[in-house]
């Protein structure tokens, strides 16, 4: 939608406005509006906007809470199973039901397959194109020349002698590695369907557990595919390490691209059935037993790993969003089940009333709200870093996870992969990086693929132990209460995911899901704090060699895509005519845009 960025007093007259709307090779409708200082080669200003309205929190009201997994999975056509899983966790708490261990291991296996599938296809078939030969040649021919001369340090592991060979292998559709990654995505999708029935809207997930019929053959079929993926990881991790390390060497200062203050959120993933009873009063304890540790990370340090603290600190701010304020609306929850006060800005108390209007970057400009985490003094604009960097950072720093295949050390995560068809045992170690930036977000995605594969090996072993012991039940009965307050915490592929439920008279009175997109894509809030996309792009240096006339914005795109943006389609709304100051480039990759 056309729009004009606001003018400011004393603004440099040589700033060039450049807009990318929609951003390609992501999911959904995301626009990035910038002002670029080509003289000093940096982004001076950035606004992130989405032209879609999601109405799930409205039409969930009055529904049977047992239907919430099936309804919420339709929020997204990419990570719908993450929503379904989180809804199951939420209703388990509301109904007071504890699923059998085998059911939990099956859910963990399904979610592990989802991480492997989605991170793989995004890393090497979507964001990977930003680093392919075609893109580098067009934007940084000097870097391409260096790549042709640069030996790949781990060529023996991945088979590509020069860095330029890796870039060529990432070319869309023609690249060898690009095509290989597509094949692996098919395998991992099959793995998911073995556990949860259908991708991406599970047919077997249900409050109380899962309806999958567990047999040794099902786990054998899963494991056969998993071992192929494990072998693939032994190639993928060193390949990406070589590629990303090269960019630091070829472009000194590239660590500043997409860099922001380390403010990371991770809500934890993969429940441990030996500890998780889904009771709110014990949530802090069983949350710490997850196989990905929940945490809020501020300036690189863990400030809490308690899901109760995480829940109570959530605030949904407005400021630049197209919604009515609900400060004086109904208060659904005054205290949590432990007696702690609950703020009116908490998702339990949110009332969603859309207020469509013309996009105005000086006022309201997006349908995304501004979730913040209140630490008692500041409303922190946490990001997920696309998911993996927050998960690995939180798990590494806490040092709680140790399952043999994966071990958190306090400063790193060790990933131990067993012998496969053609490769021996391999140990990878992800170390907490110096920065939260574009390159490190992308690097973490690769390591978390390996982490997920290693965790899946452990989950398979645990599931088979249940089978061999004769404990084959996967679901527990429950009764829907007349009144309940509940929440569920999980990690969607792209990061933090929480569902917040209030039941009255046996029906849903209020339901608010908070996936990673509102956290990452949030706009400036009532205090003027920019959201993570905006913050990461603002002041990012420009390394692209093209001038304004042929500018593609590859550094900006790398910064944005490193978050793995996902703004799936809801209700599309056109909000006025506006005026285009100047659009220099719209990256449609060969497609002709019809006006």
PLM segments and residue spans:
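Metal/cofactor-centered catalytic core regions of large enzymes
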Residues: 2-595
């Amino acid at each position: 939608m056309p729009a004009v960025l606001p003018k400011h007093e004393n603004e440099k007259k040589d700033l060039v406005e450049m807009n990318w709307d929609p951003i390609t090779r992501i999911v959904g409708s995301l626009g990035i509006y910038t002002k670029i200082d080509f003289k000093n080669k940096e982004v001076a200003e950035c606004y992130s906007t989405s032209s879609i309205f999601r109405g799930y929190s409205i039409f969930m009201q009055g529904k049977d809470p047992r239907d919430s997994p099936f309804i919420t999975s339709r929020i997204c056509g990419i990570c719908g199973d993450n929503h379904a899983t989180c809804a199951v966790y939420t209703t388990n708490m509301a109904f007071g039901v504890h699923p059998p261990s085998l059911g939990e291991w099956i859910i963990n296996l399904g979610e592990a397959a989802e991480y492997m599938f989605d991170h793989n296809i995004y890393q090497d078939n979507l964001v990977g194109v930003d680093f392919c030969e075609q893109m580098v040649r067009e934007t940084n021919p000097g870097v391409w020349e260096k790549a042709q001369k640069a030996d790949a340090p781990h060529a023996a592991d991945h088979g590509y002698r020069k860095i330029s060979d890796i870039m060529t292998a990432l070319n869309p559709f023609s690249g060898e590695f690009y095509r290989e990654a597509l094949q692996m995505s098919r395998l991992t999708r099959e793995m998911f369907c073995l556990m949860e029935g259908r991708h991406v809207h599970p047919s077997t997930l249900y409050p109380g557990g899962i309806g999958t019929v567990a047999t040794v053959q099902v786990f054998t079929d899963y494991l056969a595919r998993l071992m192929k993926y494990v072998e693939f990881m032994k190639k993928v991790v060193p390949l990406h390490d070589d590629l990303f390390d090269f960019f630091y060497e070829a472009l000194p200062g590239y660590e500043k691209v997409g860099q922001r203050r380390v403010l990371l959120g991770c809500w934890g993933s993969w429940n441990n059935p030996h500890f998780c009873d889904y009771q709110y009063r014990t949530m802090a304890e069983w949350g710490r037993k997850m196989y990905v540790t929940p945490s809020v990370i501020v300036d690189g340090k863990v400030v809490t790993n308690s899901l109760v603290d995480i829940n109570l600190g959530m605030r949904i701010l407005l400021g630049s969003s197209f919604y009515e304020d609900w400060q004086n609306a109904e208060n659904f929850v005054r205290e949590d089940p432990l007696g702690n006060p609950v703020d009116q800005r908490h998702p339990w108390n949110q009332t969603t009333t859309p207020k469509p209007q013309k996009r105005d970057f000086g006022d309201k400009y997006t349908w995304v709200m501004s979730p913040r985490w209140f630490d008692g003094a500041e409303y922190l604009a946490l990001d997920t870093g696309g998911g993996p960097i927050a998960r690995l950072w939180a798990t590494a720093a806490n040092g709680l996870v140790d399952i043999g295949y994966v071990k958190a050390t306090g400063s790193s995560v060790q990933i131990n992969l067993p012998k496969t068809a053609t490769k021996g045992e391999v140990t990878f170690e992800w170390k907490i990086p110096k920065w939260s930036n574009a390159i490190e977000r992308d690097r973490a995605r690769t390591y978390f693929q390996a982490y997920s594969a290693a965790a899946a090996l452990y989950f398979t072993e645990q599931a088979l132990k249940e089978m061999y012991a004769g404990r084959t039940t996967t679901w527990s009965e429950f009764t829907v209460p007349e009144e309940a307050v509940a929440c569920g915490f999980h990690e969607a592929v792209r990061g933090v995911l929480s569902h917040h439920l209030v039941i009255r008279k046996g029906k849903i009175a209020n339901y608010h899901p908070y996936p990673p997109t509102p956290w990452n894509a949030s706009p400036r809030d009532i205090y003027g704090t920019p959201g993570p996309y905006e913050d990461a792009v603002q002041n990012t240096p420009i390394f692209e060699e093209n001038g304004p006339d042929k500018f593609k914005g590859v550094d900006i795109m790398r910064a944005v895509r490193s978050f793995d943006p996902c703004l799936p389609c809801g209700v599309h709304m056109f909000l006025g005519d506006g005026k285009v100051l100047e659009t220099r480039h719209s990256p449609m990759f060969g497609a002709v845009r019809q006006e």
